């Protein structure tokens, strides 16, 4: 029997704003670096009667920027209330979470509708296995992005989150990697039967979201196939087992008994305010990719790789500017940044920003190759060393320390060539009988003997002279 299966997925994504102080008090937000329950005050641990301060300005600015970057319409000249969202959990001492009504609405990102963007406070951290709660995180500003249920496969949701995290890095001031959490909503239709929506709470990685969707797709399909019913419910993600488990039947908005927080003035955004934030907005990755192709005439694939990492893209532009913004300069920059540097980064599983390499380092290296101080092969070794030394040594220092400058002394080169010829009887024979390519292995030997410090062109010249006589 043929199967007709489709799914719809929507996400509620939470990301922390990198502010110094919390959303409604002046406690610091570096909760990961300090002893439990030290960054706390009556406001952020919800003492009755503790009066919150007006919301952190930077947090609001960042929420505006995220909403704008996601193409939202901003809520202008209207009261944006903070509401009390009531629920009972050990990480929430006041019994309610302060969460704003939308700051921006009706956006779109990668073809997925953005329902709304709003601001809220992070709760504390409850550790059920220890029975302890750490309130250091409580009150840290969070931006929540709610999408429409537009994603149709686990792969699409995964790509959406990857691109969103990349956007967070572009925007800056957000703690994307490491703090991103997503509530994942999924419903499926199987052979004409529509299941109810299931929510899986607090999935804290892209891989987790992907696994949840894969798992739920199969679980829900199996329930419907057996003639069962998909309940409207909230499930938990058991990360160690990569499965989901029923938690409770889904709350409706009524269960949270939302009321505007009487202790907090609503935010009112003006066009002026939004324009000021917009003036500081960075170029989006998509626009940068397009601009790279148009401005530098590089391949779309190369642009994609460079733009996937904001720092790498910046270095590329700075290096091109230094080398001369022409065909040669651009092609050198593509070779040594997009190909070679990227290869070393991927091999070491690190991002460019973790290497402490500076654009000047790349310019110095490329110039050394251009003026033939070092061979291309040595260039590759130096790049590996630059990454390994985390930018502490300049290419010039590494080249001289390792004694890797190109051999200028012809007698030294001739000696290496003679030795290589001596060791390559078969190849020389082949070459003499007309196989030009046989010479490559002899050149390779010379490179080995000189530890790559020979210029291949010069080597071929000397070899030919010696063999052809
Ligand atoms: Zn506090």
Curated annotation (Swiss-Prot):
Keywords: ATP-binding, Ligase, Nucleotide-binding, Protein biosynthesis. Transmembrane segments: none annotated. It catalyses: L-glutamyl-tRNA(Gln) + L-glutamine + ATP + H2O = L-glutaminyl-tRNA(Gln) + L-glutamate + ADP + phosphate + H(+); L-aspartyl-tRNA(Asn) + L-glutamine + ATP + H2O = L-asparaginyl-tRNA(Asn) + L-glutamate + ADP + phosphate + 2 H(+). Its EC number is 6.3.5.-. It comes from the Archaea. The keyword Cytoplasm does not apply. It is an enzyme of class 6 (ligase). The keyword rRNA-binding does not apply. One of its GO terms (biological process) is translation. GO terms for molecular function: asparaginyl-tRNA synthase (glutamine-hydrolyzing) activity; ATP binding; glutaminyl-tRNA synthase (glutamine-hydrolyzing) activity. Allows the formation of correctly charged Asn-tRNA(Asn) or Gln-tRNA(Gln) through the transamidation of misacylated Asp-tRNA(Asn) or Glu-tRNA(Gln) in organisms which lack either or both of asparaginyl-tRNA or glutaminyl-tRNA synthetases. The reaction takes place in the presence of glutamine and ATP through an activated phospho-Asp-tRNA(Asn) or phospho-Glu-tRNA(Gln). Belongs to the GatB/GatE family. GatB subfamily. Heterotrimer of A, B and C subunits. This is Aspartyl/glutamyl-tRNA(Asn/Gln) amidotransferase subunit B. The gene is gatB.
């Amino acid at each position: 029997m043929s199967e007709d299966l489709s799914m719809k997925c929507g996400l509620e994504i939470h990301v922390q704003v990198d502010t110094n102080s919390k959303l409604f008090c002046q406690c610091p937000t570096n909760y990961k670096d300090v002893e439990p329950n030290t960054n706390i005050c009556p406001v952020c641990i919800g003492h009755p009667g503790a009066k919150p301060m007006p919301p952190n300005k930077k947090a609001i600015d960042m929420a505006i920027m995220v909403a704008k970057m996601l193409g939202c319409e901003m809520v202008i000249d209207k009261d944006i209330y903070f509401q009390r969202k009531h629920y009972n959990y050990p990480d929430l001492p006041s019994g309610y979470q302060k969460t704003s009504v939308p700051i921006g609405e009706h956006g779109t990102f990668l073809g997925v509708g953005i329902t709304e963007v709003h601001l809220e406070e992070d709760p504390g951290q409850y550790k059920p296995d220890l029975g302890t709660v750490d309130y250091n995180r409580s009150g840290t500003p969070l931006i929540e992005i709610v999408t429409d249920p537009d994603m149709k496969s686990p792969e699409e949701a995964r790509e959406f989150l990857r691109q969103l995290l990349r956007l967070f890095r572009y925007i800056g001031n957000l703690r994307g990697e490491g703090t991103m959490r997503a509530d994942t909503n999924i419903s499926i239709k199987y052979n004409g039967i529509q299941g109810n929506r299931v929510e899986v709470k607090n999935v804290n990685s892209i891989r987790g979201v992907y696994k949840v969707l894969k798992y739920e797709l199969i679980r829900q399909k199996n329930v419907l196939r057996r003639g069962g019913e998909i309940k409207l419910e909230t499930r938990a993600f058991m990360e160690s087992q990569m499965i989901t488990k029923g938690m409770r039947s889904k709350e409706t908005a009524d269960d949270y008994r939302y009321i505007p927080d009487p202790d907090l003035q609503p935010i009112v955004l003006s066009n002026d305010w939004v324009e000021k934030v917009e003036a500081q907005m960075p170029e989006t990755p998509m626009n940068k990719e397009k601009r790279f192709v148009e401005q530098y005439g590089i391949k779309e694939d190369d642009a994609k790789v460079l733009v996937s990492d904001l720092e790498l893209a910046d270095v590329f532009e700075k290096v091109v500017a230094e080398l001369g913004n022409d065909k040669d300069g651009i092609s050198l920059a593509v070779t040594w940044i997009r190909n070679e540097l990227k290869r070393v980064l991927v091999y070491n599983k690190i991002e460019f920003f973790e290497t402490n390499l500076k654009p000047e380092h790349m310019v110095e290296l490329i110039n050394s190759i251009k003026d033939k101080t070092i061979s291309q092969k040595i260039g590759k070794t130096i790049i590996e060393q630059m990454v390994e030394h985390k930018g502490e040594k300049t290419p010039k220092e590494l080249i001289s320390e390792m004694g890797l400058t190109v051999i200028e002394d012809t007698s030294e080169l001739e000696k290496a060539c003679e030795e290589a010829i001596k060791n390559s009887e078969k190849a020389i024979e082949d070459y003499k009988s007309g196989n030009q390519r046989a010479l490559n292995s002899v050149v390779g030997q010379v490179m080995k003997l000189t530890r790559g410090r020979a210029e291949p062109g010069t080597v071929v010249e000397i070899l030919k002279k010696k063999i052809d006589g």
